[in-house]
């Protein structure tokens, strides 16, 4: 079995947003929203669904800054005033288990090697299957219907990392 680790976005990239006005956010093409559906606003720094009434930023994020044709950015939700949550090795955050997901596998050069769409409850099996391919260096999880990036999944060589 290959060990893996879910990697959330670093909240420090977004902390400055907490101090901006609606006008300043708008000038940066960022929208401050109030969560009105649960689940429905998956946060990329906590890898949890934001709670009803909570505020989230909707931003365009450069989630695959590679020198390949697969360079990509897209919309993501960031919970206001939250810190990055770290997950232990081989732990899958529960927000992934109830979504239709797209798993994209990349090599060390940022080239896509494999991809699949499936229900989240089989995510662990898909991660293990993909990481059995030695050419695959890392994975990206996206929400399949809207196509939005969720997080990076790294292959971990040593269970103590």
Q: Which positions does each model-derived feature cover?
A:
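Short terminal or interdomain "cap/linker" segment that borders an active site or interface and mediates
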Residues: 145-161
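Generic beta-strand structural signal
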Residues: 74, 99-101, 137-139, 147-149
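Short, well-ordered loop/turn elements at secondary-structure boundaries
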Residues: 51-52, 72, 134-136, 144-145
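Extended boundary segments
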Residues: 1-19
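Short, flexible beta-strand-to-coil junctions
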Residues: 60-63, 142-146
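Short, hydrophobic/π-rich interface segment
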Residues: 102-138, 142, 155-157
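Conserved mixed alpha/beta catalytic, RNA-binding, or beta-rich assembly cores of soluble enzyme
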Residues: 22-116, 126-127
């Amino acid at each position: 079995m290959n060990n893996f680790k879910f990697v959330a976005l670093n909240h420090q990239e977004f902390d400055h947003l907490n101090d901006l006005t609606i006008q300043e956010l708008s000038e940066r093409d960022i929208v401050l929203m109030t969560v009105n559906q649960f689940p429905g606003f998956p946060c990329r720094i906590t890898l949890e669904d934001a709670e009803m009434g909570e505020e989230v930023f909707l931003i365009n994020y450069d989630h695959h800054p590679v020198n390949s044709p697969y360079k990509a950015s897209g919309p993501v939700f960031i919970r206001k005033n939250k810190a990055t949550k770290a997950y232990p090795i081989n732990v899958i955050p529960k927000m992934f288990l109830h979504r239709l997901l797209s798993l994209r596998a990349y090599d060390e050069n940022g080239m896509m090697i494999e991809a699949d769409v499936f229900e989240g409850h089989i995510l662990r099996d898909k991660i293990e299957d993909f990481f059995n391919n030695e050419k695959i260096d890392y994975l990206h999880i996206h929400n399949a219907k809207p196509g939005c990036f969720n997080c990076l999944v790294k292959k971990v060589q040593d269970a103590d990392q």
